[in-house]
């Protein structure tokens, strides 16, 4: 690591911590030449393979941008979207390792978005799952209702 003060390449690690839910490592370093302390963040690269075969780095910003359109006019904050993108990244890393198909990212977005806002979920799902009729919406709404009934507290008799 280059020291930001003197550009020396020699430094020692003073402290290391896992951050961002295990996605990154924060290292506190000290330059061996000028003794300046500085912080570095190390993150493993998550590669996304798109439909056309092109591979690029995972982008939380792209997740946020895609979901933000579905959340337009809804009571969803930027912090909510950042949290969702973080959750999607963690889920994808846990399930697929260091490389994932773009389609699988879309699938990973659906559960946390459904928990965040069901209307935004339906909007996103309608595009992602290529809804072509009102019946597609009705089927998805029926699925949501069944899930609500399955999660409803039972009346203890």
Curated annotation (Swiss-Prot):
Residues in unnamed zinc fingers: 3-34
BP term (GO), one: negative regulation of DNA-templated transcription
Cofactor(s) the protein requires to work: Zn(2+)
PROSITE patterns per record: ATP_CONE
This protein's UniProt keywords: ATP-binding, DNA-binding, Metal-binding, Nucleotide-binding, Repressor, Transcription, Transcription regulation, Zinc, Zinc-finger
Co-factor binding details: Binds 1 zinc ion.
Record-level Gene Ontology MF annotations: ATP binding; DNA binding; zinc ion binding
Entry-linked InterPro entries: ATP-cone_dom, NrdR-like_N, RNR_NrdR-like
TM spans (from-to): none
Superkingdom of source: Bacteria
Domain ATP-cone: 46-136
Function comment: Negatively regulates transcription of bacterial ribonucleotide reductase nrd genes and operons by binding to NrdR-boxes.
PANTHER family noted in UniProt: TRANSCRIPTIONAL REPRESSOR NRDR
Similarity remark: Belongs to the NrdR family.
Name listed for the protein in its UniProt record: Transcriptional repressor NrdR
Species per Swiss-Prot/TrEMBL record: Corynebacterium urealyticum (strain ATCC 43042 / DSM 7109)
């Amino acid at each position: 690591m280059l020291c930001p003060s003197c550009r020396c390449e020699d430094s020692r690690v003073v402290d290391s911590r896992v951050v961002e839910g295990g996605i990154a490592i924060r290292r506190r370093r000290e330059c061996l030449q000028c003794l300046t302390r500085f912080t570095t963040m190390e993150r493993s690269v998550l590669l996304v393979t798109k439909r056309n075969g092109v591979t690029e780095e995972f982008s939380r910003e792209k997740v946020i941008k895609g979901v933000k359109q579905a959340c337009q006019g809804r009571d969803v904050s930027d912090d909510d979207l950042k949290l969702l993108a973080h959750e999607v990244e963690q889920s994808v890393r846990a399930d697929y390792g260091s490389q994932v198909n773009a389609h699988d990212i879309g699938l990973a977005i659906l559960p946390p978005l459904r928990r965040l806002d069901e209307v935004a979920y339906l909007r996103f799902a309608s595009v992602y799952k290529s809804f072509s009729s009102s019946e597609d919406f009705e089927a998805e709404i029926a699925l949501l209702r069944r899930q609500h009934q399955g999660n409803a507290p039972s009346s203890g008799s």
